[in-house]
Amino acid sequence: MSQLDSAQLPNEANEVGEDGCYVGLTHDKLDVQRTMDRVRSPEAGAIVVFVGTTRNSFDGKPVKELNYTAYNPMALRTMISICKAMKTKHGLKGIAMVHRLGVVPISEDSIVIAVSSPHRQAAWRAGEEALEECKAKVEVWKREEFEGGEGVWRANRDGAPGQRIDTAEPAVGAGSGGEIDD
C-alpha cells in the first residue's frame, strides 16, 4: 500500500471499534442501516436505534442549520468508554454510536446510536442511557445557526445555555462537553 497522509484517509482516525463497541465521527451523512448492521447479532432479540435530527426551531426561533465541532481524539475516547460501560451494564451484544460533524441541515441526522441485546427492555434502557451520557460527556459542541445570521454555541445537550458569538469557532476552554457560560 502506498503511503497516504491522514487527509486522504479521513475516516481512519475518526472511528474506533473494539469488543462489540463501535464509535465514529464523520462529516458525511449518517448511514442508519450501516450503524444497525454493526450491532446485529444472532444472539440478539432486539436492536434499538436512536436517530437525532436537526429540528427547525429552538426556543421559538427559526433554526437554519446546526454546525458541530469536536475534539476528535478525546471525543472518540469518551464515546468508546460510554459504549463499553453500557455494554457491560446492560448485557448488550453490540453498541454503536456515530456523530456527524460540520453543517447538518434541517431534518438531517446528527447522531445515530444502535444497541443490540437478547431482550428489548435492556436495549431500550441502554439506548436512552447511552444518548444521555453522550450528550453530557462527549467533547462535541454545536453552533445553532438561526435565520437572520445569528449563531449560538452551546454544549451538545438539551437546555444547555448558549453564548451568542460572532466567530465560527467555540470559545477556548469551553470544557469537555460542559456548558458554555453566558
UniProtKB/Swiss-Prot annotation:
Mention one GO molecular function. Answer: molybdopterin synthase activity
InterPro entries on file: MoaE_sf, MOCS2B_euk, Mopterin_biosynth_MoaE
Q: Where does the protein end up?
A: Cytoplasm
Q: Which GO terms describe its biological process?
A: Mo-molybdopterin cofactor biosynthetic process
Q: Which reaction does it catalyse?
A: 2 [molybdopterin-synthase sulfur-carrier protein]-C-terminal-Gly-aminoethanethioate + cyclic pyranopterin phosphate + H2O = molybdopterin + 2 [molybdopterin-synthase sulfur-carrier protein]-C-terminal Gly-Gly + 2 H(+)
Q: In which pathway does it act?
A: Cofactor biosynthesis; molybdopterin biosynthesis
Quote the Gene3D superfamilies the UniProt record gives.
Answer: Molybdopterin biosynthesis MoaE subunit
Segments for region (Disordered) = 152-182
This protein's GO cellular component annotations are: molybdopterin synthase complex
Q: What is its main location?
A: cytoplasm
**Pfam families xrefs:** MoaE
Q: Where does substrate bind?
A: H119, R120, K135, K142, R143, E144
Please explain the role this protein plays, according to its UniProt record: Catalytic subunit of the molybdopterin synthase complex, a complex that catalyzes the conversion of precursor Z into molybdopterin. Acts by mediating the incorporation of 2 sulfur atoms from thiocarboxylated MOCS2A into precursor Z to generate a dithiolene group.
The Swiss-Prot or TrEMBL record describes its family as follows: Belongs to the MoaE family. MOCS2B subfamily.
Q: How does it assemble?
A: Heterotetramer; composed of 2 small (MOCS2A) and 2 large (MOCS2B) subunits.
**Record protein name field:** Molybdopterin synthase catalytic subunit
Whose protein is this, by species?
Answer: Pyricularia oryzae (strain 70-15 / ATCC MYA-4617 / FGSC 8958)
